[in-house]
Amino acid sequence: MKTIIVFLSLLVLATKFGDANEGVNQEQMKEVIQNEFREDFLNEMAAMSLLQQLEAIESTLLEKEADRNSRQKRCNGENVPCGPNHSTCCSGLSCEETFGYGWWYDTPFCVKPSKG
């Protein structure tokens, strides 16, 4: 019974003095929240500034790329179908009928030229 009275008295004291600190805690929480929002805002502004700089660099690079006409000619690699309906073979390869799989697909393939 004595322990229950002690715990009840501690509960009453904690409730009474806990309310006194509530205003201080709320002010501290407001300060913390405001500081976090300031930091988030500053971080967001820095990120936006960095993004704008990257976009500017990217646009200048794309302009240089467009000026150079850098598109490469497409060609077929080794063991790729070639012929009138397909693009040409890359350098070092020739479009030939092969016995291995060309007869199955009924089309010539890009292969290394035979030495003979």
Swiss-Prot record:
* Claim: Signal is one of the keywords in the record: yes
Where mainly found?
secreted
Cysteine pairs bridged by disulfides in the record: 75-90, 82-95, 89-110
The highest taxon in the source lineage is: Eukaryota
GO CC, any one term: extracellular region
Q: Which residues cross the membrane?
A: none
Q: Which family is this sequence assigned to?
A: Belongs to the neurotoxin 14 (magi-1) family. 06 (ICK-Trit) subfamily.
Protein name stated in the entry:
U16-barytoxin-Tl1f
Organism equals Trittame loki (Brush-footed trapdoor spider)
Q: What is the lineage of its organism?
A: Eukaryota, Metazoa, Ecdysozoa, Arthropoda, Chelicerata
